[in-house]
């Protein structure tokens, strides 16, 4: 029957957090929920990034952040912070002060550090480059401008990106402006 629902989260310790006090439901409406382990998600990203590096292929993340506006940017943010772990750990205090949001991608980092003193900005940029050098090459949105698919959560939309890669024989654009075999996650 029609009525109101309350959405709650109960953590592992039993503490309850109300996520939404009142959600109107119509008769016959189906409500479902799911959960995901952040630990397992991050481990999965670590494995896939390492595998792309071992196979010398591009690493590419494909989500639907324009439609899945709550979940997919969070998934994207975890991928960004796993790939650039050293940067986010080393510069955590600075990023917190600047309001950097990993869910908005590497582009948010670039925007927020733009106003820092030149030496501090250069250090962060060098650390980003070190992560890129240590990891697999990234699938590029725009290789001419250095825009990776970890820059903005809505730049690579699975509905458009995957058919293109499949039609191209599993190849995507790399940092060198050339096509390369691609691991799609």
Which ranges hold each PLM region?
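Extended, well-ordered protein cores
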Residues: 1-77, 86-185
